[in-house]
Amino acid sequence: MVHHIVMWKFRPEVEETDKARRKAEMEKNLSSLVGKIPGLLSASFVKEPIASSTHDMALVTTFEKAEDISAYSIHPEHVKVADTYVRPFVTERACLDYQD
């Protein structure tokens, strides 16, 4: 199993009142990719990190093998979701992948 964790910060121009809606849209659409993209076994979304966190939200995914992360990143369904619900609203991205 390979785990892929991605964290983001909102762009400064995203209104505080809009952040909860944006997080909900990200969660719904990123989670919907399970079953659509080969090798993607699970996805969970962190909408409410604790105060000591450096990022506003995170996606935690599990894949069968490391190669599946590369295929996921360019899969048309993932690109569509990222281009519509994630990239327009985030400014900073951090990623950590690990195998257990």
Predicted regions and their residues:
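Short S/T/G/P-rich N-terminal loop/turn motif that feeds into the first structured element of a domain
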Residues: 1-56, 64-74, 97-100
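C-terminal structural segments of small proteins and small subunits
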Residues: 66-96
